[in-house]
């Protein structure tokens, strides 16, 4: 999978492409419905398979939220998507200038100029200045076809990144794993702590979790991977184990 960062400069791609588009935080089973549609269309039409996402939350860039936290980091998303056999991952460098683009300018710059022949998006996808663009805007464009994926339900409710964050905040890891379609995972570097656990005979590893959303405070059974080797353990989320 080739990773292409899009910053407004011309990209030399001439092959016809089928691309999903969205933020894809969590890469949950609703998102995977879009990825599977990309695979289906690409196999049928002979297109290259792609996914287009953004490097930052639009609301964060626009100053409407103070913290930028994710269910899956960009590195997580890259690792997960590499397993899906995509040809391209397009990462739009989201800036205030990108946010100010009209829907028509966004389509021209980020879809038509990339030779996207088929767009796959969720039913509630919005884009362009003031979120003025939607699925009907895309469908009105004559240069490509569009697949609109309806909502994916779990227990009668729409699966969304917002719902998963709420479930995670409640510490309901079992339901979260069902919504993700895999086990919840975070990654980070081990950093130096106060060595309290070591002093009482229970050495611990303090992990810098970067900008992840985390479950509520508590103690959780985990499997930790270090250099590819898995270890069963307990994880305390909070201040004093």
Predicted regions: what is each one?
Residues 193-241:
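Phosphate/ribose-recognition catalytic cores of enzymes acting on nucleotide-derived substrates
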Residues 2-9:
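Short acidic-hydrophobic, aromatic-tinged amphipathic segments that line or gate anion-handling sites
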């Amino acid at each position: 999978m080739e990773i292409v960062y899009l910053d407004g400069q011309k990209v030399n791609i001439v092959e016809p492409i089928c691309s999903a588009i969205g933020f894809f935080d969590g890469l949950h089973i609703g998102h995977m419905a879009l990825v599977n549609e990309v695979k289906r269309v690409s196999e049928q039409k002979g297109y290259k398979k792609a996914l287009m996402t953004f490097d930052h939350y639009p609301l964060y860039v626009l100053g409407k939220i103070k913290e930028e936290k994710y269910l899956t980091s960009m590195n997580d998303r890259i690792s997960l998507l590499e397993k899906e056999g995509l040809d391209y991952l397009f990462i739009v460098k989201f800036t205030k200038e990108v946010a100010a683009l009209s829907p028509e300018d966004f389509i021209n710059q980020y879809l038509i100029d990339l030779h996207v022949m088929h767009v796959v998006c969720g039913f509630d996808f919005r884009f362009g200045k003031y979120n003025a663009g939607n699925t009907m805007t895309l469908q009105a464009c004559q240069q490509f076809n569009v697949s609109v994926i309806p909502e994916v339900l779990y227990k009668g409710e729409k699966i969304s990144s917002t719902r998963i964050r709420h479930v995670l905040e409640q510490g309901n890891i079992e339901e979260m794993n069902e919504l993700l379609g895999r086990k919840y995972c975070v990654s980070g570097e081990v950093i130096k702590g106060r060595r309290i656990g070591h002093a009482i005979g229970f050495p611990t590893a303090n992990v810098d979790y970067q900008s992840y959303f985390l479950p509520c405070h508590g103690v959780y059974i985990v499997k930790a991977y270090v250099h590819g080797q898995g270890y069963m353990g307990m994880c305390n989320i909070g201040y004093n184990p």
